[in-house]
């Protein structure tokens, strides 16, 4: 989707004030409330990977999926800049088939509105 090219470029700037850390802590709290053994998360619609990086800081292994190559490229750059070991993949979440099991999946922000 070509529309995401410019959006990806400005995404981090648009959401510079977004509190990803608190959102990740909220997600973690919800996951722990229902299952304390969750350690692997797949994030559908990861965008530039900010939630994934914050979740990794909380001890989770994350795999970020987004349909935009531009978003994934920036997510990889962001993770590398912060020294984070996160896997990011380009895929359409409607057709994605995971090659391994995950303990939980998340889809944050307004991902479904793009489908």
Predicted feature residues:
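Class I SAM-dependent methyltransferase SAM/SAH-binding core
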Residues: 42, 49-95
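A short acidic, Gly/Pro-enriched loop at the edge of an enzyme's catalytic core
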Residues: 97-104
């Amino acid at each position: 989707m070509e529309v995401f090219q410019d959006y990806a470029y400005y995404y981090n700037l648009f959401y510079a004030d977004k509190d990803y850390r608190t959102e990740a802590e909220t997600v973690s709290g919800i996951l722990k409330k229902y299952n304390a053994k969750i350690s692997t998360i797949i994030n559908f619609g990861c965008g530039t990977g900010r939630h994934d990086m914050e979740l990794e800081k909380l001890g989770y292994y994350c795999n970020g999926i987004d349909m935009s190559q531009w978003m994934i490229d920036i997510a990889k750059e962001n993770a590398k800049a912060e020294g984070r070991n996160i896997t990011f993949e380009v895929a359409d979440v409607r057709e994605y088939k995971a090659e391994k099991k995950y303990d939980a999946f998340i889809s944050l922000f307004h991902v479904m509105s793009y489908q």
